Regions:
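Short acidic low-complexity segments
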Residues: 29-38, 51-54, 173-189
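Phosphate/diphosphate ligand-binding glycine-rich loop within oxidoreductases
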Residues: 41-115, 129
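Oxidoreductase and adenylate-handling cofactor-binding alpha/beta cores
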Residues: 97-113, 155-158, 290-301
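NAD(P)-binding Rossmann-fold cofactor-contacting core
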Residues: 155-173
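Rossmann-like adenosine-cofactor binding region
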Residues: 167-262
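Rossmann-like dinucleotide-binding domain for NAD(H)/NADP(H)
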Residues: 218, 224-311
Length: 311
């Protein structure tokens, strides 16, 4: 079995992968450097590859994505019909939640404003700040990342509720969980609204003018899920009017965010370029490698894959 590894692995990671499939042939490269010949010869691909390259596959058994998202691979015929597809849901909870938590807390403490003053050599007091202690936090998308984020907020004394499509099963860190029908009521109560929702027909454009108007005056909004949740002009309007105290996003639509986007200059807006879920935190890559190794074992044993995706 030829196993094409596109992940930026180190020696320890290689040992983990190779011990999960002893005697098999491992080829290590990167997504950018992988050739059509390597892809054509692969029985297993570990990592994300340009979907157009998959047309070269001749006997692919498994495409194990390094990302939690997989939208680019769902179009009919993208992944060979006989191949299995799996993702890395569960690998990014720590990294993304810590990043978004830091963004929210920095907004609540006016740190971006103080950074601007520092660059201008100005010693000024920007006034009152807010706290997560006793704050009402609403998490949209109560999966792995949302659960990690809720844990961080609870550690600061916040009250955390969640919204998810199937609210009957959820991490115990949430004090309560509702379905989407309760969204307007919960938005009106929350001091912080943080979204980690995937991109679906139901979520695209969900954060629009009505959404922001329903939010509590002076609340904060954060998006670490998918950029197409937000109608950018409506978010800008909510910030410019002062209805929202601030917003923090690590995802936008489109990406990269055009230089002409009004989001760049919106007041009390903090933007990072979709980097919270990359491999900047070593633990994230460790998690991805562990999932890949587990699925190599499952594949050889004919067992159900972890994070299996129907396509």
């Amino acid at each position: 079995m030829n196993i094409l590894v596109l992940l930026p692995v180190n020696d320890r990671h290689r040992a983990i992968l190779e011990s999960s499939a002893p005697g098999e042939d491992f080829i290590y490269t990167s997504s950018d450097a992988a050739t059509r010949e390597q892809v054509a010869d692969a029985d297993v691909i570990l990592g994300n590859i340009d979907p157009d390259m998959l047309t070269a596959c001749e006997h692919l058994q498994l495409l194990q994505l390094q990302t939690a998202g997989y939208d680019d691979y769902l179009a009919a015929g993208t992944v060979p019909a006989d191949a299995k597809l799996s993702c890395s849901v569960g690998a990014y909870g720590q990294a993304v939640s810590e990043h978004m938590f830091a963004m929210v807390l920095s907004m609540m403490k006016r740190l971006p404003g103080y950074h601007d003053l520092q660059r201008e050599h100005r010693w000024e007091d920007l006034g009152p700040v807010t706290s997560l202690k006793n704050a009402n936090v609403l998490v949209l998308g109560a999966g792995d990342i949302g659960g990690h984020f809720a844990t961080l907020c609870r550690s600061m004394g916040a009250h955390v509720r969640g919204i998810k499509r199937h609210p009957l099963v959820y991490p115990i860190v949430f004090e309560d969980m509702d379905g989407m029908d309760a969204l307007p009521e919960r938005l009106a109560e929350a001091d912080v609204v943080a979204s980690f929702m995937p991109s679906t027909p139901e979520t695209r454009g969900l954060a629009n003018a009505e959404f922001f108007a329903t939010m509590k005056p002076g609340a904060f909004f954060a998006n670490g899920g998918r950029g197409d949740l937000v109608v950018a002009d409506d978010l800008v309007a909510a910030l410019e009017s002062g209805h929202l105290a601030g917003a923090a996003v690590d995802v936008t639509d489109p990406e990269p965010l055009p230089e002409t986007s009004p989001l760049w200059d919106a007041p009390n807006m903090l933007i990072t370029p979709h980097i919270s879920g990359w491999f900047h935190l070593e633990a994230t890559l460790n998690n991805v490698v562990d999932i890949a190794a587990e699925n190599l074992r499952h594949l050889q044993a004919g067992e159900t894959l972890r994070c299996w995706i129907e396509h």
